[in-house]
Structures are given as C-alpha cells and as structure tokens.
Amino acid sequence: MFGRILSSLTILVFALVVGAELAIADDYRPAPGIPDRYGILYDTPIYDPVSKSYFALIWAHKTVYRGTDWQTANAEAMSREYKGIRGRLAVVDSLEIHEFLERTFHPNVDAWIGLRYWCQKRMLEWSNGRIAKRSFQAWDLNWQQDVYACKSGDKNTDFMPVAYTPTDKGFRWIGKGRHKEYFAYFVEFPTGHP
C-alpha cells in the first residue's frame, strides 16, 4: 500500500516538474516579429537580397533544459513553409550570407545550420544535397568540440552536424555529436525573390 502511494506521488511530482518546465519554456518563448528581452528576433523570416532567400532563427526549446538535435531541426525546417516555399536548414556558403545572419539575428545561443560532415566519406554536405566547396568556411579554431562526434558505431550513416557559436563567442562553425541539442536553428526559404 505504502509503495503504491509513494509510486503515485513520484509520478505526480515528475508530471508537475515536466509540466512546469514546459510552461517556463513557453513563457520565455518570444513572439514572432518582436525581439526578445536580449534583442534577438526569433521565428521571423527576413529577406536577404544577395542570396534571394528568407532566413529565420527558430526558437527550438523543447523544455527549459532540452533543445533540439540536428536531425529534428532538419525535419522541422523542411516542414516549414513561407510564401509557398518549403524551408531547409540554412545553407551558409558565402561570406555575405554569414554576415547577414550575424548582423540580422546575432544569436546568443548555439544554432544549427544545414551542414554536416559525413565521417566515413570525409566530406561536408549542405541540406540541399550539394557537397560543400572550400570557397567559404567559418570554422572555429576549436571546431570539433565533441568527443562523441563521428563515433556512433554505424560508419555508413555516421555524421557530425554543424552549428554556429553565439555571436559573443565569435559566430563560428563547430562540429558536434549527432545527439547534441541546441535551443535554436537557422532555416532558409530560397524564394528567389522578396
């Protein structure tokens, strides 16, 4: 009897804690089009005339303590639509796009982009399927920051996703393990026009 009561209380406390985390995460969720308390604009597509794409920094908090892994961010980006165009994790293949993202969104958290390193093949691939050229790169000096990157055990499907560091840490690319979670990601809508 006592064991059942204790078990029920444990479940109730767990549910309250998880519910509180979700409520707190939602309380801090900024409204689209309105900068948050740090001046960061989330969930609002902004047009870049150089690339002819819209970009948005997406709020990706699952709870206060949980973010979104790269694969989930990739799927969520592809499920988004703006002006009739499907989204994708952002392809940052030029200095102009890099500077646009930094200047426009200046994130204070790490944020996924549409780049991954295929470990077995030793190649970088963008979310649009193109192989990354060496023409533009924004790697941090300490770019591989995860001892678990490229060590999932499945050599054929193992990859290291790439994210931006916050602007106060240089706004540079870093590689992480597949299961790392971040609180934001960049989505791109390649409309070709405003």
What are the language-model segments listed below?
Residues 1-5:
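Positively charged n-region of N-terminal signal peptides that target proteins for export
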Residues 6-7, 151:
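Intrinsically disordered, low-complexity segments enriched in Ser/Pro/Gly/Ala and basic residues
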Residues 22-194:
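Extracellular, disulfide-bonded carbohydrate-recognition/adhesion ectodomains
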